[in-house]
Amino acid sequence: QAMTELLGRGRHFSAVACYNDSMAAGAMGVLNDNGIDVPREISLIGFDDVLISRYVRPRLTTVRYPIVTMATQAAELALALAEQRPAPEITHLFSPTLVRRHSVVAPQEGDKS
């Protein structure tokens, strides 16, 4: 629905970053239905690297967070607090990874959108 509204505004754009991969897959469907080639005309990127990102065509470029590591550390912290053990004095920084697939290309020369 958001992609339909965006296309309806009549403005030129060359890329869309979506909140998650499911929304990106929906946006890709709308673009395809409107005869817009992903990524040649519009690049598309998702977020979370769920299964659908590997099965849409073109395969979706996305951002992956280390969810299992994050969940494990959160569970360990919750258990420590539940057992009234002191919480570790550690700050955890989790770095995302760009998963390059086929839905993004470099902008065309002179494209400022």
What do the PLM-derived regions correspond to, one by one?
Residues 1:
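ATP/NTP phosphate-donor binding region
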Residues 4, 8-17, 21-110:
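Flexible loop/turn connectors
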